[in-house]
Amino acid sequence: MKPTIVLVGRPNVGKSTLFNRLTKTRDALVADQPGLTRDRHYGIGRVGDRDYLVVDTAGFDPVAKDGIMHEMARQAEQAIAEADALLFMVDGRSGLTPHDEQIAARLRRAGRPVYLVVNKSEGMERTMVAAEFHALGLGDPLPVSASHGEGVKQLLDLVLGAFPPDVEPEEDEGRTPRIAIVGRPNVGKSTFVNSLLGEERVIAFDMPGTTRDAIAIPFERDGRHYTLIDTAGLRRRGKVFEAVEKFSVIKTLQAIEQANVVVLVLDASQDISDQDAHIAGFILEAGRALVVAVNKWDDVDDYRRELIKQDLTRKLNFLSFARFHYISALKGAGVAAVMKSVDAAYAAAMVNLSTPRLTRTMQAALAKQAPPRHGVFRPKMRYAHQGGNNPPVVVIHGAALDHVPTSYVRYLERTFMEAFKLQGTPLRIQFRTAHNPFIGKE
């Protein structure tokens, strides 16, 4: 599981700059819950072969009682509760402030590792920085310059070194599919889960200290075994009531990472929101097989149905590989069809592709449409083989493959998916270029 790193500090100490540095300006997820004046931002970063989740909180005032600052503090408190590590950022130029001391007092009670990051410290003596901020009682200050990148790699190495390496979940002998049900609050996720598990199923409560952990629930349906990666904010015996569900972006992202197949639940009575699109985008980025269930279809008339289909086409057009179902989770209508698509998507995600057939498919694609030149060189693709599952990865070997345009990569992805009838899963292509060892030598 990716470690979650939360950035905390008073306003204008450089949290957003460090966030952009840690995520290399990749698109962030935003918790766009109504009424939030300033949203938390979520992004994925990578250093070497390690991935991590970064959360950028608004300027934090732990003693705020009302108004905007209180709302921002509430959001920061939620992020702190879900953190694996806290980066407490202070401003080396302006020095230690009473606001910093208030935040430090709160973080000492957080029960999480805290790293004291002194930003804007370029050109400053390390001993001077350490002397002033040691008084906070949070260990050795770590000088960085988020804007210039100085000290950031050392900071990441220190933080990530405290966590075990990422380990992909092993498939059991029966290759039981792991399913995550995700979506915004009140779209019908828990009702859908009840349709799968049955209302008398006992589901564990969140226990103290485990609020961040997704619960794995084995279940059987139509003679097939599955594991549900459950993230609902409320888990109880019998019906799960949507009205008190707590939405956690971090839990959602972790469930997606652990799953083989994700069921994205949408609400037919509401327009597709930015948050829906952000969640869908993360599913795609994670490479997970996907089934989309548009719930509450029985509650809307034909006019509304046509509008929502147009909205889906416009805002989720990047999910062309997924099957869409229009269901009523409350009545159980369409749930069986969703599970049939889950099975098909899982089979596609775990498919084994033969090297000869992959190479023939690639050669046919090249004959139909050659890759464009880059300068004086045209990419040469010699053979292809499978490099992994969940999602399927096709590795193409050749020469001058460093600058294949994205449009041509998409063309190859579509070609492979159509040739192998892969429905419900994205497909990734990786290039391996044979570099000339004599270049640059006399």
UniProtKB/Swiss-Prot annotation:
Source taxon at top rank: Bacteria
Q: Does the keyword Protease apply?
A: no
Which residue numbers delimit the KH-like domain?
Answer: 351-435
- Keywords, alphabetical: GTP-binding, Nucleotide-binding, Repeat, Ribosome biogenesis
Instruction: Kindly list the positions annotated as binding GTP 2.
Output: 183-190, 230-234, 295-298
Q: Name one Pfam family in it.
A: MMR_HSR1
Gene3D superfamilies assigned: 3.30.300.20, P-loop containing nucleotide triphosphate hydrolases
Biological process according to GO: ribosome biogenesis
- Which residues are noted in the entry as GTP 1-binding? 9-16, 56-60, 119-122
Lyase: is it a keyword of this entry?
A: no
Tell me the ranges covered by the EngA-type G domain, including all copies. Answer: 3-167, 177-350
- Show the GO MF annotations: GTP binding; ribosome binding
NCBIfam families xref list: GTPase_EngA, small_GTP
What this chain does, per the record? GTPase that plays an essential role in the late steps of ribosome biogenesis.
Q: Which HAMAP family match?
A: GTPase_Der
Q: Which family does it belong to?
A: Belongs to the TRAFAC class TrmE-Era-EngA-EngB-Septin-like GTPase superfamily. EngA (Der) GTPase family.
Subunit comment for this entry? Associates with the 50S ribosomal subunit.
Q: What is this protein called?
A: GTPase Der
Q: Which organism is it from?
A: Aromatoleum aromaticum (strain DSM 19018 / LMG 30748 / EbN1)
